[in-house]
């Protein structure tokens, strides 16, 4: 079911999104990673992480990771999306180039597993900035919050992104939520003042996202009560 959601949403969003170019990185062919041993906190008081997700053969493949007790088979595995960790604990990062060697791939896989496990071990909501690469030079940043209490990933849609970014980035994000965080649901946070809000609501409603009341206990914990009326919330429950 999630495969259907990803493909349908990416196709529709590719036709609907009209915006400025997304951010660029000056790295062309090298893989990058940065890390920090100290934990950082967001303005909302949550621990904060920055994770990079990349697509295509330019990036290394994941290796099977240990799963938690609520292990499930992922219907998105055939996409074979590639992932990497950009920063373990801070949103600002220093980049270091790594050669495409087997030892580097092994190190990155171990590093990724450790960071994901650290996120899953957090007892309170955790902020995750997802840097979703479309090419080695282009990416979009999606701000999310993972709530371990309800096992939900809350996603703020970027204000601007290109057709290509909207298609591939959302697929990568859904895969990350289902395969890495093993979420039970994804909640989208859509600002009411967006010009493309009607199209977004129709798109996500078509593939199974349902409205969530701002007063619902499933509403995002990271948005202040007085600001929740500025957003529309839509939830999709991930089937096991």
From Swiss-Prot:
Any one GO biological process: positive regulation of protein catabolic process
Assembly information from the UniProt record: Interacts with ODC1 and thereby sterically blocks ODC homodimerization.
Basic and acidic residues compositional bias, start-end: 69-84
Family statement: Belongs to the ODC antizyme family.
Pfam families: ODC_AZ
Biased composition (Low complexity): 34-43
Native source species: Aedes aegypti
Cystine bridges: none
Compositional bias annotation for Polar residues: 21-33, 85-95
Gene3D superfamilies: 3.40.630.60
Region (Disordered): 18-45, 69-95
Free-text tissue specificity from the UniProt record: Preferentially expressed in adult female midguts.
Source taxon at top rank: Eukaryota
Name recorded for this polypeptide: Ornithine decarboxylase antizyme
Family matches, as InterPro entries: Acyl_CoA_acyltransferase, ODC_AZ, ODC_AZ_sf
PROSITE patterns registered for this protein in UniProt: ODC_AZ
GO cellular component: cytoplasm; nucleus
Example GO molecular function: ornithine decarboxylase inhibitor activity
Function: Ornithine decarboxylase (ODC) antizyme protein that negatively regulates ODC activity and intracellular polyamine biosynthesis and uptake in response to increased intracellular polyamine levels. Binds to ODC monomers, inhibiting the assembly of the functional ODC homodimer, and targets the monomers for ubiquitin-independent proteolytic destruction by the 26S proteasome.
């Amino acid at each position: 079911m999630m495969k259907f959601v990803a493909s349908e949403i990416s196709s529709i969003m590719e036709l609907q999104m009209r915006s400025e170019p997304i951010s660029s990185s000056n790295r062309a062919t090298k893989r990058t990673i940065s890390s920090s041993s100290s934990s950082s906190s967001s303005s909302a008081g949550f621990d904060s992480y920055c994770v990079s997700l990349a697509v295509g053969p330019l990036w290394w493949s994941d290796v099977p990771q240990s799963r938690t007790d609520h292990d499930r088979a992922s219907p998105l595995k055939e996409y074979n999306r590639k992932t990497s960790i950009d920063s373990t604990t801070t949103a600002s990062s220093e980049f270091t180039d790594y050669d495409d060697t087997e030892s580097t791939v092994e190190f990155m896989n171990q590093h990724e597993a450790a960071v994901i496990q650290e996120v899953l071990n957090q007892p309170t909501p955790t902020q995750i900035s997802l840097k979703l690469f479309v090419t080695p030079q282009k990416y979009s940043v999606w701000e999310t919050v993972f709530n371990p209490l309800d096992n939900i990933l809350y996603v703020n849609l970027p204000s601007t992104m290109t057709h290509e970014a909207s298609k591939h980035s959302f697929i990568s994000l859904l895969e990350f939520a289902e395969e890495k965080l093993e979420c039970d649901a994804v909640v989208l946070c859509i600002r009411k003042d967006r010009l493309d809000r009607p199209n977004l609501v129709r798109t996500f409603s078509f593939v199974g996202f349902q409205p969530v009341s701002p007063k619902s206990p499933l509403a995002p914990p990271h948005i202040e009560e007085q600001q929740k009326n500025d957003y529309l919330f839509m939830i999709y429950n991930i089937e096991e």
